[in-house]
């Protein structure tokens, strides 16, 4: 049986819109992503609401600060029983390690996942704006190696780096792929996109899918279609 899961990105600006959307998924045990837009505008009540519905939470806040601040931020989030929290690999080894330490200290099973390069970033943008001279793939692999050294649970990357990340860090090192689109979907602001089947073939553990599901006329049907392709 596959351990792969589809995570639905709840890219809404209100709890009311979120609840109306989730009501379409009666009898489905979901894994959902709460990002900055939803969390910052609605606060902790959105975590309570989704947990009360029995869904798993990927809290994608991309924490990036000094190690002590990130430690206490993660520690504070442990009381809400979130399943995944993201931190920026660019924060460095100590910051990443302190994020994981906060989970250990609270005796929780929350996964800490590192952000490598955003799927909206092209190689040219990375090289000219971030002043990173390597290839984009090498930058992602370097961040993944750092994440492994820091003892966190995995990373977020595009589909196209996934297999090499697994080869470098082992199959138990989790990889989450955003930027998932079906053939007929608009790629929007994503530059490095792929299909659910691509992600499956590249050995991803999770895919994050937002607009292709949330903007569809039948979100449940589209979710189940994508789930069949990936899981």
From Swiss-Prot:
Q: Is Lyase among this UniProt entry's keywords?
A: yes
Give one GO biological process term: 'de novo' UMP biosynthetic process
Which protein, by its recorded name, is this?
Answer: Orotidine 5'-phosphate decarboxylase
Cross-referenced InterPro entries, in alphabetical order? Aldolase_TIM (IPR013785), OMPdecase (IPR014732), OMPdecase_AS (IPR018089), OMPdecase_bac (IPR047596), OMPdeCOase_dom (IPR001754), RibuloseP-bd_barrel (IPR011060)
**Pathway info:** Pyrimidine metabolism; UMP biosynthesis via de novo pathway; UMP from orotate: step 2/2
Q: Which Gene3D superfamilies does this chain map to?
A: Aldolase class I (3.20.20.70)
**What reaction is this protein's catalytic activity?**
orotidine 5'-phosphate + H(+) = UMP + CO2
- UniProt lists the gene as pyrF
């Amino acid at each position: 049986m596959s351990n792969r899961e589809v995570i639905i990105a709840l890219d809404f600006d209100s709890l009311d819109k979120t609840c109306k959307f989730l009501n379409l998924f009666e009898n489905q045990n979901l894994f959902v992503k709460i990002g900055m837009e939803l969390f910052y505008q609605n606060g902790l009540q959105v975590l309570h609401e989704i947990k009360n519905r029995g869904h798993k939470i990927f809290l994608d806040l991309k924490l990036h600060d000094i190690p002590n601040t990130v430690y206490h931020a993660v520690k504070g989030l442990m009381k809400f029983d979130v399943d995944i929290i993201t931190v920026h690999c660019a924060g460095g080894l100590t910051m990443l390690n302190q994020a994981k330490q906060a989970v250990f200290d609270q005796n929780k099973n929350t996964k800490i996942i590192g952000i490598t390069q955003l799927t909206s970033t092209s190689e040219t943008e990375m090289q000219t704006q971030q002043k990173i001279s390597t290839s984009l793939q090498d930058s992602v692999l370097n961040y993944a190696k750092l994440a492994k050294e820091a003892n966190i649970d995995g990373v977020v990357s595009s589909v196209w780096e996934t297999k090499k990340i697994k080869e470098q860090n082992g199959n138990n090192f989790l990889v989450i792929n955003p930027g998932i689109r079906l053939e007929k979907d608009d790629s929007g602001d994503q530059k490095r996109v792929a299909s659910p089947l691509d992600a499956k073939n590249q050995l991803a553990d999770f895919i994050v899918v937002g607009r292709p599901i949330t903007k569809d006329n039948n979100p449940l049907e589209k979710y189940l279609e994508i789930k069949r392709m990936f899981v």
